[in-house]
Each structure stands twice: as C-alpha cells, then as structure tokens.
Amino acid sequence: MAAKQVLFADEARVRIVRGVNVLANAVKTTLGPKGRNVVLERSFGAPTVTKDGVSVAKEIELKDKFENIGAQLVKDVASKTSDNAGDGTTTATVLAQAVVQEGLKYVAAGFNPIDLKRGIDKAVAAAVEELKKLSKPVTTSKEIAQVGSISANSDASIGQIIADAMDKVGKEGVITVEDGKSLENELDVVEGMQFDRGYLSPYFINSPEKQVAALDDPYVLIYDKKVSNIRDLLPVLEQVAKSSRPLLIIAEDVEGEALATLVVNNIRGILKTTAVKAPGFGDRRKAMLEDIAILTGGTVISEETGMSLEKATLQDLGQAKRIEVAKENTTIIDGAGDGKSIEARVKQIRAQIEEATSDYDREKLQERVAKLAGGVAVIRVGAATEVEMKEKKARVEDALHATRAAVEEGVVPGGGVALLRAKQAITGLKGDTADQNAGIKLILRAVEEPLRTIVTNAGDEASVVVNTVLNGKGNYGYNAATGEYGDLVEQGVLDPTKVTRTALQNAASVASLLLTAEAAVVELMEDKPAAAPAMPGGMGGMGGMDF
C-alpha cells in the first residue's frame, strides 16, 4: 500500500480552498451575457473554445493533490447540477466558492463547523421555499425562446429554434441535437412514429426520386418471429390482395423464399408489399412492437399469446394513412389506433420512466413516449468550423436542458435577482445557537455572489449594482447585456426555477461538507528513479574476438 500524507485543521482547509478557488475562478469568467470564453487544450486535434461552465470544470486537474481535492469537490457540484437541471453549472460553482470562502473565515475565528452547517441548511431550505413562491409557469412560446436564449449565452436564434421545435413536437416530444451540414441552424421535424429499420430489399422502392417505398393507406402486419416460409404468409396475403391495399410486414426478419416471393409479387404489381425488421432488441423490441400495434390499431401476432401467422386475419392487422420506408428508417404517419388506447399506453410508459434507475433506460422510454404522443424534432447546428460547431452544439444542448427545466418547474427573474429576492426569507431566520446564526448570515452574503460575478464580467461596479437591485422589488434587476435596470421578466431575462434551486442546494451541500472536514489524506507522490543512460552505439572493443 502506498504511503499517505495527512494534513489537519486549517492547514488542510487552506490548501483545499486554494484548489476550489483555482477551479471556480476559471469557471466564473464565463458567467453572464458578457462572460468570456475559456480555451481548452486537447491532447490531439484543435483546442476547444467554450463558455460552458461544466466543460471547463471537467478539464481541470491540479498537480497539488490537496488543492485537487477542492477542485474535484467543486467539479462535482457543477456535474451534479448539470445532471439534475441541465444548466446552472457556473452559478453553482460561484455559489460553492462563496460559501466556502465565507465559511472558512468563521471556522478560522473559532465557530463550530457542525453548527455552521446546520445554519447553512436552514437558510438554504428557506431560500428554496422563497424561490418556489417567486416562480411562475412557462406558458408561451416566447417565454421558452427567452429561457433558451439566456442559457445559450444570449443567442436569440438558438432560443427561437428550440421554441419552434417544442411547438412542433410538444413539450414532451423528443428533440435531438446533431451536427449540421450548412452555416445556419436547421430544424427537421418527423411527424408520426419513426424507427431505425429500413426496407429488407431495394426492390421494394416505388418512389425512385426519394429512394423510398411509399405505401398509402396500408395494412400493417406485426409478427415477433422470423418469416422464412411463404406458406405461413399466404392466408393473410390473399386477404390483403382482395382488398387491393398495400401491406407493410414488420417481423424479426423476413428471409429466403418468403422475401423472394414478396419481391416478385411487388415487381409484377400483384401485391404492393414492403418488409422491414422489427426495431430494438430483446424486451425493448417486444415493447416497441406493442407500441406500433397500439398506434396502428393492430395486434402483435405472437405465439406467446396463442396466435399464429397462418390464422391471422385482416382484423389483426394495423392500418395507417401513409408509411414511408427508407434505407435506414421507417415512418408511420397517422396510425389508425384508438386515441384512448394510445393515451393509456403513454401513461403506462410515463410510470416506467418514474421508476427507471438508469439514464439510458429513461432516455429510451422518453423516446417511446414522444413517438406515440408527439413526434421527433432534430436541430442541426450549423457553423463555419469544427471548433465553432462543438462550442455552439454544447450551447444548444444547454439551452435545450434549461427550457425543459423551465417547462417542468417554471421560471424566476434571471440575472442573479431571484437569489437576492430569496434573502428576505433568510433575513428573519434565527438559529438555535450563535454559530447557526453565523451559518445563516453566511448564506445571506453568498446569494449575492452570482449577481456580483455577472456585473464584474460586464465591467461594472458590483457593490453599487447589488445595493440598487436590493432597494428595488419583485422582478426589478440589472440587465448586464444592456447595462440598464428594469423589469427583467419583461425584458426576457429569465432563469428556470429548477436550475437556480438545484445550483443553490448542490453548492451549499458540497461547500458545507468541506467546512466540516478536519483532516485530508492524499497519496504521496513516488520518486521515480532516473532513467538508465542509453547504451552507446555499437559494441566497441569486441572486434578481434575469435569465435
């Protein structure tokens, strides 16, 4: 086991706080509409330029191991806030630094760290309640655009494209962000349900200019096993042929004789069919087939439920207004499913989302809800260079998370004002001891820090602005983008309540843990022996030896 180095009390805290300050000072330069960029070196390729707090935090690793403890703890604040709320990482970092710095003064003056922590917890709980009272729901597309713009560092075009996407697919719809091919941001919306499986044979294509198999008013056969014998399919094919409507077959696979017969029938115009593989794998495949069945008003033909392909009738088949099958995906438009059944299915999946433990499962379940309830929107981010593209894409993703948080819990006035207004709830608080009162006082000072940082980054005098805003009421605050005071909600300077709340809770949680630490243990750096000198070229002096 490697040897350890241990530091105690103030000696440990001072070193740890030094690390907190290094990371926080790098991150907080990005806060506000006039925040600066940070350039991150990459081990290969071009450097990355970013204004995203969590991206900066994740890159920082300090040489001094005690300082690194502080940096990593604050990095955890940023990451947790990003995971929970999707934004507010810089605000959380600034708050954590403020609580640590103020708290350290009290600890050095002999206050009890445990009581300080209790006071901090009381003050934060009161501030969170006040934030909830200040919060107002987001109802209009304009408000969604404003929240997105603020989160994307005052880029109105990003806010607008996110608002447009939410208009098209609904607030529950899936919105994904991808690299674009042009200089402009683009929005693509897929109406209906789309899954990532295409036609099994190019001979199914009937629209050469779009390279798709387009089926109007088709039947949909959904089967959970492989189809290789055409005899199994014949009864249902004959019934569909009599109706003179096209047929889409979704099965685990269609191969051999069955596929060949379908292709020949299609080419000769006897029966217009297309076959695709079922989406997903394992249990997820079963669930997705069930989704498709409910959307189209059909039934999954499965041996598990006592059904067989030979006995399938037209009543077991789903229907849709139109289906387009491309090389790599299939889109079902306007399925004939019953509205109440679809609603019940969506409700069932939402219940599964609540219980899901992994992010991956949750994401896949949300995708299924969107495909049933709304649609899928793709924002393609355009930029001139790859470096700009990465930076812009990160901002779009941040803005998207922020707008989702705003829809979930509402919005409060931005620009650090909501935290200042929360001071009135903290001011009247009394702790059980003088040390707890010190913890409450500490939060009163810390909640000013985000506004101070925004103002400093904008090149103005922080103390003057903070006092002016405190003398105002409600939404009155300082708009750093214009350098003017006014009603921030009217001016569109909004923050999601969830983001502000999460930032404060996470910052106070980690910072108060740091203040109660009395010892720090790190691994000693091993002194590596100097590398052996290189052997001289050739084996001099060995010539003349007889072998």
UniProtKB/Swiss-Prot annotation:
**GO biological process, any:** protein refolding
UniProt keyword 4Fe-4S, yes or no: no
Which reaction(s) are listed as its catalytic activity?
Answer: ATP + H2O + a folded polypeptide = ADP + phosphate + an unfolded polypeptide
CDD domains registered for this protein in UniProt: GroEL
PROSITE patterns xrefs? CHAPERONINS_CPN60 (PS00296)
The top EC class is isomerase
The places in or outside the cell where this protein is found are: Cytoplasm
Identify the main location.
cytoplasm
Q: What GO MF terms are annotated?
A: ATP binding; ATP-dependent protein folding chaperone; isomerase activity; unfolded protein binding
Q: Please provide an example of a Pfam family that matches this protein in its UniProt record.
A: Cpn60_TCP1
Name the family the entry cites: Belongs to the chaperonin (HSP60) family.
What subunit structure does UniProt give? Forms a cylinder of 14 subunits composed of two heptameric rings stacked back-to-back. Interacts with the co-chaperonin GroES.
Its recorded name reads Chaperonin GroEL
Q: Specify the species.
A: Bordetella parapertussis (strain 12822 / ATCC BAA-587 / NCTC 13253)
Taxonomic path = Bacteria, Pseudomonadati, Pseudomonadota, Betaproteobacteria, Burkholderiales
Gene that specifies this protein = groEL
